Amino acid sequence: MTRSSVLADALNAINNAEKTGKRQVLIRPSSKVIIKFLQVMQKHGYIGEFEYIDDHRSGKIVVQLNGRLNKCGVISPRFNVKIGDIEKWTANLLPARQFGYVILTTSAGIMDHEEARRKHVSGKILGFVY
C-alpha cells in the first residue's frame, strides 16, 4: 500500500487512537509539517505533550492524548485560500461557529484560521481540527 500523505496517515492514527480510548499514539514517519500541525493542536488543548524520537531514519513522534479531540483531518488538494474566503471554509469544514480550527500553511508559518486573520495572511489549507 502506498502512502498518499504522511500528514493524513498521522492524523488518521490520532483519530483512531482517540476513538478507541488510548492515552498515547505512535506516529511514524515524522515530518516538519506534522510537528507544526501538532503544535497548533497542542496550543488549543486538543492533545497533550508530544515527543519527537530520532531513530536515524524518518523519526517517530509519541503523542499523549487527553480525550478532547472529536475529529481532525486533512484537506486534499491543498486549496489556496484568500483572507476573505477563510470564513467560507470554516463554515464548510467545522460543525459550528466558534468551535474548532481550520489550519493553514502561510508564508508566516503553519497556523489556525483565527491567527491568520489577525496577521492578515492567506495561504493554502492543510486541514481541520475540532
From Swiss-Prot:
MF terms in GO: structural constituent of ribosome
Gene Ontology cellular component list: cytosol; cytosolic small ribosomal subunit
UniProt keyword tRNA processing present: no
Keyword S-adenosyl-L-methionine attached: no
Main location: cytoplasm
Pfam families given in the database record: Ribosomal_S8 (PF00410)
Keywords assigned: Cytoplasm, Ribonucleoprotein, Ribosomal protein
Localization per record: Cytoplasm
GO biological process: cytoplasmic translation
Subunit structure as annotated in this protein's UniProt entry: Component of the small ribosomal subunit (SSU). Mature yeast ribosomes consist of a small (40S) and a large (60S) subunit. The 40S small subunit contains 1 molecule of ribosomal RNA (18S rRNA) and 33 different proteins (encoded by 57 genes). The large 60S subunit contains 3 rRNA molecules (25S, 5.8S and 5S rRNA) and 46 different proteins (encoded by 81 genes).
Family note: Belongs to the universal ribosomal protein uS8 family.
Note: Present with 40400 molecules/cell in log phase SD medium.
PANTHER family xref list: 40S RIBOSOMAL PROTEIN S15A
Cited function: Component of the ribosome, a large ribonucleoprotein complex responsible for the synthesis of proteins in the cell. The small ribosomal subunit (SSU) binds messenger RNAs (mRNAs) and translates the encoded message by selecting cognate aminoacyl-transfer RNA (tRNA) molecules. The large subunit (LSU) contains the ribosomal catalytic site termed the peptidyl transferase center (PTC), which catalyzes the formation of peptide bonds, thereby polymerizing the amino acids delivered by tRNAs into a polypeptide chain.
Protein name per the record: Small ribosomal subunit protein uS8A
Organism, as annotated: Saccharomyces cerevisiae (strain ATCC 204508 / S288c)
Lineage, top ranks: Eukaryota, Fungi, Dikarya, Ascomycota, Saccharomycotina
Gene from which this protein is expressed: RPS22A
